[in-house]
Amino acid sequence: MIAYLISGLRRTLCLSLLMLGSVHSMAQETIDFSPDAPGATTGVDIMKQGKIDWETGIGLEWDRRNGEHARTFTINTSMFRLGLTPQAEVRLQIDECITHTPEGNFGGIANATIGTKIKVYEGGKVFPKVAFMGTMLIPGGSNAHYLPKHLGFQTHLLFENELSSKFTLGYDLGAEWNGDTESPDLFFGANLTYQPSERWSFFVESYNRYNSKRQDDWAKPGQDSHFNFMSEAGLAYKVSPRLYVNTFYDISFNEFSRYSNIGLGVAWLLN
């Protein structure tokens, strides 16, 4: 596992040096964009037509819920967003992880998706901005440790209200099915963002899932639950009009002291 950790850190360091080396040449640019990362809920903004955004990072998850004892290191998560039209973007994501358990280590592709986000409504003084997001989860083979065995889908309606010049409230309603469970999860998330300056932003959010079938991995050992209650807090810093860096931290309210997830990331407008 140490080798994977070193490999992931090396990739991130090289990427950071590459991008930070470009900051000076980008200082005079006025181009701006809005990354989706970080956060479990998704914003309503669409990439401008023809523009490509790369959002990447690393993370470490510690999970002892329901008697498990696993540490998962995300070596690399990469989301590519391409502005297809003024109203829609195409989204591609692939994550690579390694997990350490008392029984041994395993790793591989942890997430592979293709999807779209479509602008529905621009919003008004009272009414929120609205967007639709649809995602297809690509299945893995019989030896895949993380990917679903069957094709899965996610559909979300995204909303955003500007409460003031510094505060924004976003909320996310959706359904997610990985192809392996009897029924989909219903998703609800709410995100409050505070932006005190042009460069800094801070957020806290609650994101939750409900399944009509009780899930034993959402509760203490020997128990099960219809609900999975999670929360995340984080911040982002705008290095330049094309480059953001961010960090986040997640907890689980189902078993507060038995789960944590921390990550670092960057978002880069490539063109």
Task: Please provide the spans of the model-predicted regions.
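Bacterial N-terminal signal peptides
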Residues: 12-22
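Bacterial N-terminal signal peptides that target proteins for export
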Residues: 2-13
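Sec/Tat signal peptide C-region and signal peptidase I cleavage site
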Residues: 23-27
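Transmembrane beta-barrel domains of Gram-negative outer membranes and organellar outer membranes
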Residues: 28-271
